[in-house]
């Protein structure tokens, strides 16, 4: 009797150990530091389909907290508390096809924001609505993402869609509110030749934000400024113009060369251009400013995923931002003639880095 029980117990123990080993291997494959080397290429959905050999679904909750005694950037406030829940999945349908998805929900607070009454400051600055009072804001965000990739002979094909919705508001005066919707679609293709995946992807992006500030107290209101640059404003339309609408978007081109054996030189090039249009929404619609952003991100390096993982790569990130102000004539009823356009804001940013990885 003991002998009969021993054999099933031994088989169960071996099965549990094999299952645990397989699960550990899967988690390691999806979370290893080496993936950071391949992350730029995975922006192309065709290459993302080759990211992993195994399937994995993960659920996790996190909280990001920061507190400053003095704000480093006034428009971003003195800190935040942003808890979030995430769900991620990557499923291999076969040796030649994969699907993936991501969903997240964030709901938290941002503290002591001043001189900024507009959501997505990093995206839209300096063309924001601002006041000198400010305060804490509540922030809510939804993100959904899904993609599919397949391989047909030497060809890799993939598509991906991302949607982001955000809601930022303050429930005391000045009661700012920003409602954001953003949709991004990527299409990618790659070809296998000479030991490399040669890939290209195209991205289209559409962005909208409704932005306004209200006052409920009877003690009066504070002026809202239509910011146009570093400490500059569009004085004519500052003060009581507190309802704005932003719309815009842009395009990206991604080019990649990835060695099939994970050993050799590789490169990534990201070219992008975006435009964001600001208009006043009162009893009329008045175009006010246009913000332009052109960017180049390039990565070139060498890597070897052998017994020891080694990589050395250089990154160059360049962005050119400029802002146009529309010169508006005297109104006739609710019509404002446009007399001209002046470029009154320019800002160039360049970041470079050299990274080595060994493990």
Specify the residue positions occupied by each region the protein language model found.
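N-terminal, post-signal peptide beta-strand-biased segments of exported outer-membrane/organellar beta-barrel
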Residues: 20-111
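Outer-envelope beta-barrel architecture signal
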Residues: 53-59, 95-101, 153-159, 194-200, ...
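Residues that define the transmembrane beta-barrel architecture of outer-membrane proteins
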Residues: 55, 79-85, 138-144, 174-185, ...
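Transmembrane beta-strands of outer-membrane beta-barrel pores
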Residues: 61-69, 105-109, 152-154, 163-167, ...
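Outer-membrane beta-barrel translocator domains and adjoining extracellular loop/strand segments
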Residues: 69-76, 112-118, 169-177, 211-218, ...
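Residues on the lipid-exposed face of transmembrane beta-strands in outer-membrane beta-barrel proteins
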Residues: 85-91, 144-150, 185-191, 253-259, ...
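Surface-exposed loop/turn segments flanking beta-strands in extracellular/periplasmic regions
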Residues: 113-130, 219-236, 333-340
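Surface-exposed extracellular loop regions of Gram-negative outer-membrane beta-barrel proteins
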Residues: 147-171, 180-183, 268-281
């Amino acid at each position: 009797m003991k002998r009969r029980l021993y054999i099933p117990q031994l088989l169960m123990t071996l099965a549990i150990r094999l299952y645990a080993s397989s699960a550990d291997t899967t988690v390691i494959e999806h979370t290893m530091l080496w993936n950071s080397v391949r992350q730029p290429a995975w922006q192309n959905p065709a290459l993302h389909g080759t990211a992993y050999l195994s399937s994995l679904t993960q659920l996790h909750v996190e909280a990001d907290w920061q507190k400053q005694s003095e704000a480093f950037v006034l428009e971003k406030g003195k800190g935040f508390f942003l808890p979030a829940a995430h769900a991620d999945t990557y499923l291999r349908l076969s040796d030649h096809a994969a699907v993936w998805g991501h969903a997240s929900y964030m709901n938290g607070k941002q503290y002591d924001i001043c001189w900024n009454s507009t959501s997505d400051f990093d995206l839209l600055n300096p063309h924001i609505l601002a006041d000198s009072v400010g305060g804490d804001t509540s922030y809510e965000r939804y993100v959904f993402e899904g993609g599919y990739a397949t391989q047909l002979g030497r060809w890799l094909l993939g598509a991906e869609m991302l949607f982001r919705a955000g809601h930022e508001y303050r429930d005391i005066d000045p009661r700012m509110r920003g409602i954001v919707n953003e949709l991004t679609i990527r299409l990618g293709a790659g070809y296998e030749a000479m030991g490399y995946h040669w890939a290209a992807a195209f991205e289209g992006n559409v962005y909208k934000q409704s932005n306004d500030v209200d006052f409920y107290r009877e003690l009066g209101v504070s002026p809202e400024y239509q910011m146009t640059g570093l400490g500059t404003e569009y004085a004519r339309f500052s003060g009581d113009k507190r309802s704005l609408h932003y719309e815009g978007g842009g395009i990206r081109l991604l080019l990649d060369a990835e060695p099939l054996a994970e050993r050799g030189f590789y490169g990534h090039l990201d070219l992008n251009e975006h435009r964001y249009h600001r208009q006043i929404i009162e009893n009329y619609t008045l175009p006010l400013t246009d913000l332009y952003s052109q960017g180049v991100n390039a990565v070139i390096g060498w890597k070897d995923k052998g017994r020891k993982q080694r990589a050395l790569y250089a990154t160059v990130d360049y962005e050119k931002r400029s802002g146009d102000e529309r010169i508006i004539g005297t109104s006739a009823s609710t019509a404002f003639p446009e007399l001209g356009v002046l470029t009154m804001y320019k800002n160039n940013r360049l970041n470079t880095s050299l990274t080595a990885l060994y493990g």
